[in-house]
Every structure is written in C-alpha cells, then in structure tokens.
C-alpha cells in the first residue's frame, strides 16, 4: 500500500480505483487489481 499526501493522482492510475473514507483516513481501493491500494496522510 502506498502512502501519499495527495490522493488525486493515485485514483487516476486505474479505472477501477475507488476513493473510500475509513476511520478518518482516505483510502484508494481497487478490487480487480489490489496493487493500486493507497492511503492519504
């Protein structure tokens, strides 16, 4: 999982990326290709 301060560029890496808020943190999840998981902050 990548950790970045900006999530905007990470959600554009793959067309199936979804931005999800969990426990006050912003995550990018991808069910078809889990390599693109990321977290903000």
Swiss-Prot record:
Keyword set includes DNA repair? no
Q: Is Ribosomal protein a UniProt keyword of this protein?
A: yes
A single GO CC term, please?
ribonucleoprotein complex
Any idea which UniProt keywords this protein has?
Ribonucleoprotein, Ribosomal protein
Q: Which GO terms describe its molecular function?
A: structural constituent of ribosome
Where are the bilayer-spanning segments? Answer: none
- Write down the Pfam families for this protein, in alphabetical order: Ribosomal_L36 (PF00444)
Query: Origin, by domain of life?
Result: Bacteria
Q: Which GO terms describe its biological process?
A: translation
Concerning its family, UniProt says:
Belongs to the bacterial ribosomal protein bL36 family.
PANTHER family, alphabetized:
50S RIBOSOMAL PROTEIN L36 2, LARGE RIBOSOMAL SUBUNIT PROTEIN BL36B
Q: What is this protein called?
A: Large ribosomal subunit protein bL36
Species? Maricaulis maris (strain MCS10)
């Amino acid at each position: 999982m990548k950790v970045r301060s900006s999530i905007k560029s990470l959600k554009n890496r793959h067309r199936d990326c979804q931005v999800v808020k969990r426990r006050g943190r912003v995550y990018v999840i991808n069910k078809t290709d889990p390599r693109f998981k990321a977290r903000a902050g």
